[in-house]
Curated annotation (Swiss-Prot):
Chain residues that bind GTP: 10-17, 57-61, 118-121
Keyword terms: Cell membrane, Cytoplasm, GTP-binding, Membrane, Nucleotide-binding, Ribosome biogenesis, RNA-binding, rRNA-binding
Location relative to the cell: Cytoplasm; Cell membrane
Name of the protein described by the UniProt record: GTPase Era
Gene that this sequence comes from: era
Species of provenance: Mycoplasmopsis pulmonis (strain UAB CTIP)
Region described as G3: spans on this chain: 57-60
Segments for region (G2): 36-40
Gene3D superfamilies: 3.30.300.20, P-loop containing nucleotide triphosphate hydrolases (3.40.50.300)
Assembly notes: Monomer.
PANTHER family reported for this sequence: GTPASE ERA, GTPASE ERA, MITOCHONDRIAL
GO molecular function, one term: GTP binding
Region (G4): 118-121
Keyword rRNA-binding attributed: yes
């Protein structure tokens, strides 16, 4: 058995969560066109007969003015401890800028690192990709791969390349285990994902989700779980937006979240949502560490 621990790192919205989901062939991490969808380190476990590859998806590193943003960045830096391979992502349709260079400086001393040019379905010009690869080489990467989330073959090839960095070791997790995260965490993230999908650009970043209860009393008999959850917003004015006219918005969020949870957990779900205000939680570390980790 060969094993490997790796971290997927980069700016917000470069395809980190999409990559993890494609490797696992399971929708574990939130994927959104809106930045900062990932708030936690999320471990994904790829297993086959001969290999176990452990990947950590991380929040996008960005310049921030809030304590919450600082916490997200700190989680990404924390993920670099005691790992075997750094996987840095940069999209084909965006130039490498100061944000990328800042991250590359953070990982410059890692011997084992690869760069992935993502989203080549959006920009596949040979000239553009060649220039980007040259820039990445100048930033210290010896191995650079171009991938598209829409091309399953390129993901398979990438997995084989990553396997080259693995080493002999004992299996770390059961072979049928995809993540160390609990079903409560997956439910929480599914509710937050529904909010991201259905709310305007800024509001999803002002939301915290807490699972108040996760009852499995009827799971064995009816394959049913009952979930009660609270969605917290940053200020009073956001509460009305989240509820919507006549409760229309929160109803849509509830329906979407329930379907996501059912699909991911393979159970029937009764979902109950309520909304509360926690003023300026983004700058109160005790609050966001309690409710969003």
């Amino acid at each position: 058995m060969k094993i490997l621990f790796s971290t997927i790192i980069g700016r917000p919205n470069v395809g980190k969560s999409t990559l993890l989901n494609n490797i696992l062939e399971y929708d574990l991490a939130i994927v959104s066109s809106k930045p900062q969808a990932t708030r936690d380190q999320i471990m994904g476990i790829y297993s086959d007969d001969d290999y176990q590859l452990i990947f950590t998806d991380t929040p996008g590193i960005y310049k921030t003015k809030t304590k919450f943003g600082e916490n997200l960045n700190a989680q990404s830096y924390e993920s670099l401890k005691d790992i075997d391979l750094v996987i840095f992502l940069s999209p084909a349709n965006e130039e490498i800028g100061p944000g990328d260079e800042f991250i590359c400086e953070k990982i410059k001393n890692f011997t084992n690192k690869i760069a992935l040019i993502t989203k080549i379905d959006l920009e596949n010009s040979e000239e553009v990709l060649k220039k980007k690869a040259e820039k990445l080489k100048s930033l210290g990467f010896k191995e650079i791969f171009a991938i598209s989330s829409k091309d399953h073959g390129s993901i398979k090839k990438l997995i084989n390349e990553i396997k080259k960095y693995s080493y002999e070791g004992e299996r770390q997790f059961d072979e049928d285990m995809i993540t160390e995260k609990s079903e409560k965490f997956i439910a929480k993230e599914s509710i937050r994902e529904a909010c991201i999908d259905l709310l305007e650009q800024e509001l999803p970043h002002s939301i915290l989700v807490e699972i108040d209860s996760f009852s499995e009393e009827e799971r064995e008999e009816k394959n049913l779980v009952e979930i009660h959850s609270t969605i917290y917003v940053n200020k009073e004015s956001q509460k009305g937006i989240l509820i919507g006219k006549g409760g229309s918005k929160i109803k849509k969020i509830g329906i979407s979240a329930r379907k996501k949870i059912q699909r991911k957990l393979g159970v029937n779900v009764k979902l109950f949502l309520k909304i509360k205000v926690k003023k300026n939680w983004v700058n109160q570390e005790k609050i966001f560490k309690k409710f969003d980790n």
